[in-house]
């Protein structure tokens, strides 16, 4: 049901928002928080009827009152006369005037720049900066101030600033929340990503599966644009993504998009595990996605399946026929041998995963890839993960939006609708989205546009606040906040021996409290792929006798990834040790710093009980812990609320002196009580 904001209805009825809010609460028992709150159209119509009835009775009562009212409300007449094609611009102007009359402005985020608040207050930058200076805040035009400061500043200009209520914001997940009970769910097709080393036959394998020749049309044998395909086996569909390879797979995961159900790792039988194969394994483990190994090129003379299985064990992947749980399927893209076995294994794995979705709800999913086409405008390949998408539907995609003008399947045919696990290419977006952006279907385009605008504003705010990834220097703080549970590392070195040495040494540092996990180890310079993996896994990159290339440096600065390089292995290990020592939970010990005997008690009505005490041992310190001991039994434990020497506040009072004190939240002090003062000292851990 459509809604209307309070200030808009007030303007339409020619009454103040305050009057309308009172009317809503008293006449209709509708609670609204402020003029930005939204109410149902049904309630709005009832109010209009009520007020129109009142107006008629007032007209019959006294015509002079009506003339006087009209004189007092010239806006109503001007509004009625000016309803025309220029309505949008004038509404905007009247809305602003309405807000000004009430002296209320709003802000949607936690902070606002001096420039923005000056514009909202309609004051010069100099005036606002001057007021801030008088409040003890030195700020430039582009500097941000928090809500509390903005509130005080607005009050100086006789204005009120309100933070837009979170309940009023259109939360997309709530808008699109559908019933996902078991009865609504239906089985869906598995979504497969193909990964592996270059030239190991990923595209040829996809080609063999689709039973069509596409490899020959590609430049240099490298995948240019395959996108996503759906194939069928025994009446069951399987969706394949080639995005291409693990770079885009991780880029999407870094943006929070987990689209893949199963990964097919292609390994050449005559080549074995190669650097990109290692990277692919690391990515799968980091994403916690099931993996099926397709041992390709078994028709080659030098093929050695057992050697590949042996090499896989070094990365924790033990084949099923070797007693492990990794499915390994020997295949040949050239002779089509083993293709059906591979597809059967995919379907078997998907059955175990119990993949389900609700096709009878609003669609949602992920952008696989997107581009700007000269003739067609923004084009996006979407993977529908839930619901059904139709031509004409309005969607919000990341920080862009649109209405679907046309939709094509993986074979390039024009289609009207698509269900879960279906890849489609769509036209009609306002801008080009990014791979990994999530899309949601909305009721109307206006809603989608509103959400997209809010997201753009949020992205801008996040950029200004410059949030950073994990670094060795701030690991302790992040552990304390509970944002980091383990230390993830990516190790690169000049030779494989150094990689293994570092991995073993670093993983041995793991304790019950702090876990060190080497996400990926490889030989060669630190590249952009390493930075992407670190971004997705919130990890740190360690380089031994290697340096990051230019692209990696740019990416690390952009994404806030910490890169550390060393020439001595010992230095790397010591740095990690130091970071982990900081990460360990601190231990504390109690240190009694003094005792005092209560000699006299004073009861003051406005303050409570004050004890006059004599320091027997050590000293008493303000804000230190305090125990009240009576006849050798601890009867209360808190802290010293106040400590005085004569009439003056004292930070501490030493042995042999008298003092006045009070205990936080305790008034039952009696003469003869012993006050034991203590502090908690941290015991710093020096070793793991």
UniProtKB/Swiss-Prot annotation:
One cellular-component annotation, GO: cytosol
Region (G5) location: 332-334
Residues that, per the record, bind GTP: 196-203, 242-246, 296-299
Bias (Basic and acidic residues) ranges: 53-62, 86-95
Originating species: Clostridium botulinum (strain Loch Maree / Type A3)
Protein family according to the UniProt entry: Belongs to the TRAFAC class translation factor GTPase superfamily. Classic translation factor GTPase family. IF-2 subfamily.
Matches recorded under PANTHER family: TR-TYPE G DOMAIN-CONTAINING PROTEIN (PTHR43381:SF5), TRANSLATION INITIATION FACTOR IF-2-RELATED (PTHR43381)
G2: region residues: 221-225
Domain of life where this protein originates: Bacteria
Protein name as annotated: Translation initiation factor IF-2
NCBIfam families, per database record: IF-2 (TIGR00487), small_GTP (TIGR00231)
Pfam families reported for this sequence: EF-G_D2, GTP_EFTU, IF-2, IF2_N
Iron-sulfur recorded as keyword: no
GO molecular-function terms, A-Z: GTP binding; GTPase activity; translation initiation factor activity
């Amino acid at each position: 049901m459509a809604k209307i904001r309070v200030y808009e209805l007030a303007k339409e009825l020619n009454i103040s928002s305050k009057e309308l809010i009172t009317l809503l609460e008293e006449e209709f028992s509708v609670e609204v928080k402020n003029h930005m709150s939204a109410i149902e159209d049904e309630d709005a119509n009832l109010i209009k009827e009520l007020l129109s009835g009142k107006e008629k009775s007032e007209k019959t009562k006294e015509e002079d009152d009506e003339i006087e009212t009209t004189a007092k409300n010239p806006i109503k007449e001007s509004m009625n006369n000016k309803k025309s094609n220029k309505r949008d611009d004038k509404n905007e102007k009247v809305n602003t005037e309405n807000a000004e009359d009430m002296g209320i402005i709003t802000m949607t985020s936690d902070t606002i720049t001096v420039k923005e608040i000056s514009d909202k207050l309609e004051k010069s930058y100099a005036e606002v900066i001057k007021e801030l200076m008088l409040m003890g805040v030195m700020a430039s035009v582009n500097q941000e101030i928090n809500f509390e400061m903005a509130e005080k500043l607005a009050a100086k200009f006789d204005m009120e600033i309100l933070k837009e209520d979170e309940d009023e914001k259109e939360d997309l997940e709530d808008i699109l929340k559908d019933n996902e009970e078991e009865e609504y769910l239906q089985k869906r097709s598995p979504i497969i990503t193909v990964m592996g080393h270059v030239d190991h036959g990923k595209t040829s394998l996809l080609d063999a599966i689709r039973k069509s020749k596409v490899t020959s049309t590609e430049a240099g044998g490298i995948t240019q644009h395959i996108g996503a395909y759906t194939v069928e086996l025994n009446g069951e569909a399987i969706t394949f993504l080639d995005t291409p390879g693990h770079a885009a797979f991780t880029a999407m995961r870094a943006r929070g998009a987990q689209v893949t159900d199963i990964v097919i790792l292609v390994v050449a039988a005559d080549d074995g595990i190669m650097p990109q194969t290692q990277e692919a394994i690391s990515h799968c483990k980091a994403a916690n996605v099931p993996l099926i190994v397709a041992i390709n090129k078994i028709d080659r003379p030098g093929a050695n399946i057992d050697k590949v299985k042996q090499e896989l064990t070094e990365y924790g992947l033990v084949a099923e026929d070797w007693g492990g749980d990794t499915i390994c399927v020997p295949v040949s893209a050239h002779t089509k041998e083993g293709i059906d076995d591979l597809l059967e294994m995919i379907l078997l794995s998907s059955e175990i995963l119990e993949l389900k979705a609700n096709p009878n709800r609003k669609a949602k999913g992920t952008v696989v890839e997107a581009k700007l086409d000269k003739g067609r405008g923004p084009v996006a390949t979407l993977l529908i993960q839930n619901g059904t998408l139709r031509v004409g539907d309005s969607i919000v995609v990341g920080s862009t939006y649109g209405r679907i003008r046309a939709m094509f399947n993986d074979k390039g045919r024009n289609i009207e609708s698509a269900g879960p696990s279906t890849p489609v290419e769509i036209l009609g977006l306002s801008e080009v989205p990014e791979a990994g952006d999530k899309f949601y279907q909305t009721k109307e385009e206006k809603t989608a546009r509103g959400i997209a605008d809010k997201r753009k504003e949020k992205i801008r705010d996040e950029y200004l606040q410059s949030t950073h990834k994990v670094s060795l220097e701030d690991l302790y703080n992040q552990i304390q906040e509970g944002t980091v549970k383990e230390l993830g590392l990516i190790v690169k070195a000049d030779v494989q021996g150094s990689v293994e040495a570092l991995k073993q040494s670093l993983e041995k540092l793991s304790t019950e409290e702090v876990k060190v996990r080497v996400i990926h180890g490889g030989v060669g310079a630190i590249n952009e792929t390493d930075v992407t993996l670190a971004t997705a896994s919130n990890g740190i990159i360690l380089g031994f006798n290697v340096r990051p290339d230019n692209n990696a440096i740019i990416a690390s600065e952009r994404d806030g990834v910490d890169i550390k390089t060393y020439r001595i292995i010992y230095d790397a290990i010591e740095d990690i040790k130091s970071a982990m020592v900081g990460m360990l939970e601190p231990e504390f010990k109690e240190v009694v710093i003094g005792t005092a005997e209560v000699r006299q008690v004073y009861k003051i009505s406005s303050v409570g009980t004050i004890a006059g005490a004599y320091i027997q041992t050590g000293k008493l310190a303000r804000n230190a812990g305090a125990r009240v001991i009576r006849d050798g039994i601890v009867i209360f434990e808190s802290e010293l609320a106040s400590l005085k020497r004569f009439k003056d506040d004292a930070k501490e009072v030493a042995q042999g002196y008298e003092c006045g004190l009070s205990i936080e939240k305790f008034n039952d002090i009696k003469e003869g009580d012993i006050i034991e003062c203590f502090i908690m000292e941290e015991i710093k851990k020096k070793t793991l």
